[in-house]
């Protein structure tokens, strides 16, 4: 069976991931006119730039959908977001600022839940708006086929007939108007935005040029913290975790995790927390650039890692970071539910997150400027009395440290011998200044 269909399957049911925007509206109407039977599926991901979710399925029916459904994905999305925080599943960082993989998390949820809904309706052909140059076409492909082994893929944007007729936004707008729908193109922004409850992605157009900075972006989850005219008073916030799960903000508990994430977004968003500018490697290895918002994810991540460093030992923390980066890359590639990802997630959640219980108090200022004011946990292995510089009882004595240092003589002697061995083989050069062999000055190489 052909998995990817290059041309419209006339007379067959096609499920389309319907956003209500110009692209998917024109595609749905065009498919109906050409003889297909479109079914529209809209994911409610708590997008901060969407005002009326219920209106989207109604518009789909007006444009010719055989049926239109709104699928509430918010609970599952937040669950996956918290799992990513517990595992540190983030691999793109620049100068200490993190991209929280909010789009990959959204695709994992959308790609499975929408296809599951289609399967319930007997719809086994799926189309969406992802382009052939991006990451989403592969993410949706993987998640769709994982959910429904009989799934076939039809994308209007890969169909030459559709492209020839409606290849651009102007043509799509004219097509909608000609069909009796007063669909005017929205005002073109200098960049494209995609969002869900966990975060927003701004990319493309002017942002493809590296001399266009974050300053051209209008945040949809935060504030322009770089604008000195925007007043942002400092604010204290306390985050509480129990066994790796965020349970309270400023002492307030919530009826569900969706409400907690919304409040975390509001708190972090007031300061522009969690915005970052990243150059990243797409799945196809080409580099792209994005500016990201994730105020709630950032707030929870900061508090979680503060507790992590106070509770776990150095080797565990090292494995958390190494495995988290590996897991973050798998998530980015659309492999969040693959066996290698599940293996990493299980270990990180079982042995790391389960011990993260306590409270962290932060002072948030502008952007990613914050201070940690207090850290409280019954599980802390940080115990200041062990290393206090004040006179008093200690868990070890000066004689104990002398013995420990004496044992170091073994590897110090071995290292010294290796250094002189490297010098004899020409890998290092002698140094009169230190008495130890040195790496040769690069300026002198080749002279």
Curated annotation (Swiss-Prot):
Transmembrane segments: none annotated. It is found in: Cytoplasm. It is an enzyme of class 6 (ligase). ATP binds at residues 17-25, 43, 129, 131, 136, 194. PROSITE patterns: ARGININOSUCCIN_SYN_1, ARGININOSUCCIN_SYN_2. GO terms for molecular function: argininosuccinate synthase activity; ATP binding; protein homodimerization activity. Its main location: cytoplasm. L-citrulline binds at residues 99, 135, 139, 192, 201, 203, 280. One of its GO terms (cellular component) is cytoplasm. This is Argininosuccinate synthase. It comes from Citrobacter koseri (strain ATCC BAA-895 / CDC 4225-83 / SGSC4696). The gene is argG.
């Amino acid at each position: 069976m052909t998995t990817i269909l290059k041309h419209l399957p006339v007379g067959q049911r096609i499920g389309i991931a319907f956003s209500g925007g110009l692209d998917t509206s024109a595609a749905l109407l065009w498919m109906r006119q050409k003889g297909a039977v479109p079914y529209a599926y809209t994911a409610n991901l708590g997008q901060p730039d969407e005002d009326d979710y219920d209106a989207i399925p109604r518009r789909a029916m007006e444009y010719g959908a055989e049926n239109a459904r709104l699928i509430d994905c918010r609970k599952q999305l937040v669950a996956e977001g918290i799992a990513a925080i517990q595992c540190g599943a983030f691999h793109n960082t620049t100068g200490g600022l993190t991209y929280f993989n909010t789009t990959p998390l959204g695709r994992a949820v959308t790609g499975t839940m929408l296809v599951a809904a289609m399967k319930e309706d007997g719809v086994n052909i799926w189309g969406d708006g992802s382009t052939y140059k991006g990451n989403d076409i592969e993410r949706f492909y993987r998640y769709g086929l994982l959910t429904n082994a009989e799934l076939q893929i039809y994308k209007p944007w890969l169909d030459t007939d559709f492209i020839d007729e409606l290849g651009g936004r102007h043509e799509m707008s004219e097509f909608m108007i000609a069909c009796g729908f007063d669909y005017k193109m929205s005002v073109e922004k200098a960049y494209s935005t995609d969002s869900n409850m966990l975060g927003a992605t701004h990319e493309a157009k002017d942002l493809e040029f590296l001399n266009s900075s974050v300053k051209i972006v209008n945040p949809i989850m935060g504030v322009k913290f770089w604008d000195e005219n925007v007043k942002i008073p400092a604010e204290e916030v306390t985050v509480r975790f129990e066994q790796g799960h965020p349970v309270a903000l400023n002492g307030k508990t919530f009826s569900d995790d969706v409400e907690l994430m919304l409040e975390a977004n509001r708190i972090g968003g007031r300061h522009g927390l969690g915005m970052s500018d990243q150059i990243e490697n797409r799945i196809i290895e080409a580099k792209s650039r994005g500016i990201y918002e994730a105020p709630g994810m950032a707030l929870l991540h900061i508090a979680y890692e503060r507790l992590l460093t106070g509770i776990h030992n150095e080797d565990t923390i090292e494995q958390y970071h190494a495995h988290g980066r590996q897991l973050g890359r798998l998530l980015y590639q659309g492999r969040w539910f693959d066996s290698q990802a599940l293996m990493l997630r299980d270990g990180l959640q079982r042995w790391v997150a389960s011990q993260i219980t306590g409270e962290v108090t932060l002072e948030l200022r502008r952007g990613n400027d914050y201070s940690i004011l207090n850290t409280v946990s019954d599980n802390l292995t940080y115990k200041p009395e062990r290393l206090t510089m004040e006179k008093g009882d200690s868990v070890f004595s000066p004689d104990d440290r002398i013995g420990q240092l004496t044992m170091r003589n073994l590897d110090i002697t071995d290292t010294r011998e290796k250094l002189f061995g490297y010098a004899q083989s020409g890998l290092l050069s002698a140094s009169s200044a230190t008495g130890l062999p040195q790496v040769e000055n690069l300026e002198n190489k080749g002279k």
